[in-house]
């Protein structure tokens, strides 16, 4: 696939690795004959390591077929995470090192997960934008402290720690943004 045909979300092969395109910048310099250049911000699949590369419009990058299968987290098998396909109930097993820091967002029965599959092999997961987690440990609210909006640390049921507003108490369910790792509101 030529560089000028690539769109955000495409998966390509580059330098022996597989990458998903997340951002594209197009530039047409005036000084050297008007050759259009494309700068791709791409992340490795699996792993999510960011790479920045520039290409001419005619450069060829082989496209890779990536399937996104909607799944539910089923259980943990030792250090591996097992996800169940929502349509055909195919189990997908991914090692903890592939899941990485996203493990702190995964709870029993979590839905809305997309398992990314290349050649029938699961290679990565894409989590929902927000997940609901329970606060298991946080300091109590200070009396009269509602005039200022001071965040305080809170330990969640997955072992993750985030900063929450002072009014959040132990046992409350909160929404956490999986992209930033920040408090996103109270859960219903």
Curated annotation (Swiss-Prot):
Annotated GO MF terms: translation elongation factor activity
BP terms from Gene Ontology: peptide biosynthetic process
Cellular component GO terms held in the UniProt record: cytoplasm
InterPro entries referenced in this protein's UniProt entry, alphabetically: Elong-fact-P_C (IPR015365), NA-bd_OB-fold (IPR012340), Rib_uL2_dom2 (IPR014722), Transl_elong_fac_P/YeiP (IPR020599), Transl_elong_KOW-like (IPR013185), Transl_elong_p-like_YeiP (IPR011897), Transl_elong_P/YeiP_cen (IPR001059), Transl_elong_P/YeiP_CS (IPR013852)
Family annotation (HAMAP family): EFP (MF_00646)
PANTHER family the record matches: ELONGATION FACTOR P, TRANSLATION ELONGATION FACTOR KOW-LIKE DOMAIN-CONTAINING PROTEIN
Family label: Belongs to the elongation factor P family.
Name of the featured protein: Elongation factor P-like protein
């Amino acid at each position: 696939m030529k560089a000028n045909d690539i769109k955000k979300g495409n998966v390509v092969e580059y330098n022996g690795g597989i990458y998903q395109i997340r951002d594209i910048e197009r530039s047409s310099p005036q000084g050297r004959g008007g050759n259009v250049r494309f700068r791709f911000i791409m992340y490795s699949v699996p792993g999510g390591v960011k790479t920045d590369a520039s290409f001419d419009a005619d450069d060829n990058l082989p496209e890779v077929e990536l399937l996104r299968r909607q799944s539910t987290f089923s259980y943990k098998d030792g250090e591996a995470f097992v996800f169940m396909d929502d349509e055909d109930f195919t189990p997908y097993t991914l090692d903890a090192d592939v899941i990485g820091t996203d493990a702190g967002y995964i709870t029993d029965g979590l839905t809305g997960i997309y398992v990314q599959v290349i050649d029938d092999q699961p290679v990565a997961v894409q989590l929902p934008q927000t997940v609901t987690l329970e606060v298991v440990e946080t300091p109590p609210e200070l009396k009269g402290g509602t005039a200022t909006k001071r965040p305080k640390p809170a330990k969640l049921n997955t072992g993750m720690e985030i900063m929450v507003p002072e009014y959040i108490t132990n046992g409350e369910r909160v929404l956490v943004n999986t992209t930033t790792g920040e408090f996103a509101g109270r859960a219903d």
